[in-house]
């Protein structure tokens, strides 16, 4: 954890702690680990992340294990429920992610799925990138199909939704230079920012304007 104003750094979790937690959970071999998809929850009290190992051709057993930890480094918890894609926090200690082709809400205290958002016919491939609006009433999910990215904007209060046109991402569909959907809300919840390729092949930022 880094204090932006002062630059003060605090180690919340060590790789040794993660290794010990994985071994205690039954992993006989723990390869070199790295941390991915680190997310603060909305009140700043809890952090969600994945401990990963054995990826991208590196030696050792493949590991993809979610954890949570409090913002002061206490209560490191191996999460036994798994939600895929790039997770997002809902309210409190509940996270949003993909499971069994559904966009679900996962309670990190109960360690179980407690709700579902929309229907798979509306939000396809929920293992992509999702972003919740500041007021929690809207969610946007981006996903890829056939080399193209598209986004679904869904209003949770009444189920209204819209899907954007397809944006061609070829040849940047996979690999380190891939064009991920990665939507982001502005602070007042009126616009959504996403990266995408344009007709001339350059990578630009795009904005979805919500008229509500």
Which sequence ranges carry the predicted segments?
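Structural motif
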Residues: 1, 56-67, 100-105, 146-153, ...
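Short loop/turn segments that connect beta-strands within beta-propeller blades
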Residues: 3-7, 70-74, 108-111, 156-159, ...
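Surface-exposed loop and turn segments in beta-propeller and other repeat-based domains
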Residues: 7-31, 118-122, 163-175
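Blade-terminus and WD-like Trp-Asp/Gly-His loop motifs, strongest in beta-propeller folds
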Residues: 37-48, 87-97, 129-138, 183-191
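Residue-level marker for isolated small/hydroxyl-bearing positions within beta-strands
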Residues: 50, 98, 141-142, 195
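Conserved blade-ending motifs and adjacent loop-strand segments that build the rim/top face
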Residues: 80-85, 117-130, 159-184
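Loop/turn-rich, solvent-exposed surfaces of beta-rich toroidal or solenoidal domains
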Residues: 101-104, 120-161
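Blade-level signature of beta-propeller repeat domains, shared across WD40, Kelch, NHL, RCC1
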Residues: 179-212
């Amino acid at each position: 954890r880094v204090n932006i104003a002062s630059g003060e750094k605090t180690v919340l979790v060590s790789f040794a702690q993660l290794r010990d937690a994985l071994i205690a959970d039954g992993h006989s071999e723990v390869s070199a680990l790295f941390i991915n998809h680190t997310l603060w929850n909305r009140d700043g009290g809890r952090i969600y992340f994945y401990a990963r190992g054995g990826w991208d051709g590196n030696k050792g057993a493949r590991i993809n294990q979610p954890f949570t930890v409090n913002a002061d480094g206490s209560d490191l918890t191996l999460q036994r429920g798994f939600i895929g894609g790039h997770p997002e926090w809902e309210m409190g200690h509940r996270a949003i992610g993909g499971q069994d082709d559904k966009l679900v809400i996962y309670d990190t205290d109960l360690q179980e799925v407690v709700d579902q958002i929309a229907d798979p016919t509306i939000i396809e491939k929920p293992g992509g990138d999702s972003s919740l609006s500041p007021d929690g009433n809207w969610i946007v999910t981006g996903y890829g199909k056939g080399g193209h990215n598209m986004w679904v904007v869904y209003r949770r209060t009444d189920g209204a939704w819209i899907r954007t046109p397809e944006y061609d991402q070829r040849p940047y569909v996979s690999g380190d230079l891939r064009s991920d959907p990665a939507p982001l809300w502005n602070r007042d919840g009126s616009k959504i920012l996403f990266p995408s390729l344009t007709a001339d092949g350059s990578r630009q930022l795009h904005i979805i304007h919500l008229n509500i």
